[in-house]
């Protein structure tokens, strides 16, 4: 087996300092949508969520599920179709409109009075509500608590210097007996500046460990041909389950 890379061979970089000053503005994220630079979107949905979804839901209905930095994630419809209420936040209005169009869902839009210039887009069925604003403005809307958070492509997209504020925002939205599903990426951060940014286990412990039990459920090889252009030669994705201590 010499020369074959496995997930057990590669140690994590515990140091996140190399990327700490990396910044992408909200305008740059919006430009990615305008220019179609959205390789982060997964048209078929996330394989690990698909694998574990029914286990997480345990046959329950009527849960409130939050999608930070939701884009046009197809998983939002998965939850809605199972009888759950979905709330998302996304800075790109284009991304939100594309979600409803591509999922063949009729919707309405209205201003959010608490945040000038912000809109909320609601499915006609009433169980999907997407806010078009910065994640850091969202607490001003008093959107309540959630039973579950699906964080794929959110924490890894947040500027490293904003992670503590982001984590505190997420924790403020969690209700009792919550399940926080978190996907992060592991690669050599000295070879790629991000985003998506590198988030090691130690960083998750730092951000969430005081409030949450942290369990790594699965680690899979996520390296694709396109990742060679990042200058890296391995990429692993890890799915964590965070629960109430």
From Swiss-Prot:
It is an enzyme of class 2 (transferase). S-adenosyl-L-methionine binds at residues 29-40, 69, 90, 134-135, 152. GO terms for biological process: methylation. It catalyses: S-adenosyl-L-methionine + a thiopurine = S-adenosyl-L-homocysteine + a thiopurine S-methylether. It holds the Pfam family TPMT. GO terms for cellular component: cytoplasm. This is Thiopurine S-methyltransferase. It comes from Pongo pygmaeus (Bornean orangutan).
